[in-house]
Regions:
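Short alpha-helical segments enriched in small residues
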Residues: 1-96
Length: 96
């Protein structure tokens, strides 16, 4: 669960929300690596400040916490989703 105030203040697609997601997941999961993703893959949902392709990836491994903002340049939902998966794999690979 994410504190409603975080979503009200920053939005569901935000650094702060992604961080809260991965931190909370690490509290309830027995996994050594936890991952959260929030973003706008399109085709709808974009705003001037949060365009299609804006994605936050959160990864927590032990005490290491990484939140990465990405701006994928495609307007194709499937392409953005594939790019997210590639980016997550790359980050996790570098952490292990």
């Amino acid at each position: 669960k994410i504190n409603k105030n975080i979503i009200k203040k920053y939005g569901a697609v935000s650094h702060e929300c992604c961080k809260a997601m991965v931190r909370n997941l690490s509290k309830i999961s027995k996994s050594k690596i936890n991952i959260s993703i929030t973003g706008i893959a399109g085709p709808g949902g974009a705003t001037k400040n949060k365009p299609v392709g804006l994605v936050y990836i959160g990864i927590k491994k032990g005490k290491t916490l990484l939140i990465k903002e990405n701006r994928f340049k495609s307007n194709n939902r499937n392409s953005i989703q594939k790019s997210i998966v590639r980016e997550v794999i790359k980050i996790v690979f570098n952490l292990i």
